[in-house]
Each structure stands twice: as C-alpha cells, then as structure tokens.
Amino acid sequence: MFVGHYGVSFAAKKAEPSVPLWVLFIAVQFLDVLWAPLVLLGIEKVRIVPGITATNPLDLYYMPFSHSLVTAIGWSVAAWLAYRLIVPTAPRRAATAVGVAVFSHWVLDFLVHQPDLPLYDNTAKVGLGLWNLPAIALGLEAVLLFGGMWLYFRLGAARRTGMLVFGVVMLAIQVFVFFGPPPASDKAAAATAIVGYAIFALVIRALERLQMVTS
C-alpha cells in the first residue's frame, strides 16, 4: 500500500479539521518513515526480488521494529502522546486522529502485503497478498485515495483543482511503482521512499495553505 494510505489522511481531516493535512500525511506513512532509515542503517532488512509479488519486488523479510503489530500499536500510542504534548491546546480528538492515522498504516498494509507483517518480533507473519492481484490492488489504492479526498471536499474546500491534480499525480506514481523497473538496491528503495514522503508532505502543506488563503 502506498498512495491509498493518504486517503486516510483526507478522511481524518474531515473527522478532525484542526489537524493539519501535512501532519496526517506523515502520520499515515509513519511506519514507513521509520522503516526507511532503519533499512539505511542496516537494522531492518529488505531484498529486491523481482517477481516475488505481481506488483512489488520488495522481499520485506525483517522489519520487526517498524511493522510488527505490537510495535505499530506502540508507535500509534506514541504519536497520540506526542501530539498531545506538542499541541497541548488541540482537542483530545485531534491526538486520537493522529494515533489512528498511524495505526491505519498497518491495517491497510495487511490487505496488500504477502505474509511478511509480523504480529510481534519477527514471527507469526500475516498479509492477505492483494499485491498479487494487480487490478484489485491498484483499484483499492485509487478508491481509498479519492474516497478520502471526496470526504475532505465535504468540508467545503474552496479550491479543489490543485488537490485533484495532486491526486492524479500520486496515482500515476503508484502505477509506476507497480509496473515500472525495480529499485536498484535496498538502500535505493529506502532513500526513495523517505524523499517521496517528505515531498508529498510539503506539497500537501502548500496546497492546504492555499486553501486557507482562498477560502
């Protein structure tokens, strides 16, 4: 799961408008934001194995710190607490929205991953494997992304064109990720991921600021 995670960001913004979209963009990818530097440091492990699934060449064989169910719950609670401490004036439900956004990553990954998501440590691995069904996997990404965006638009956002164009670009990137060439190495995959998440967060911050100026 990649761009489908961002659908949760838009839905969470609809549920709790006080949380900036860029915060929610980071929250829904937080487990991967952790995963990337852990791979770069050699703490978590991934191999590039073209064909291991129909749409994703990553053999994610060791990621107990970022993607086990137990640590996902822990990171979600930590995100809730961090938001409460960093933004003490925000309503309690704002921190809850951030925590739920973080945990949603594991839930959506469970749908698409092959059984490589550990329940705890590096054992009892699960995953429904929708990455092996390209049309369904891509359709799910699109439905989640644009479904969440539709909920966000119900807030009465004044300018929708920029958001929609961004959504189309995101989906195009998803198609490239699914069907383009595999990453050159495990480190290249991790570095590309962290740069991509940062760029997406910066773009959505700019688009939301534009919404605020023109609304």
Language-model regions: role of each:
Residues 1-215:
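N-terminal membrane-targeting hydrophobic helices
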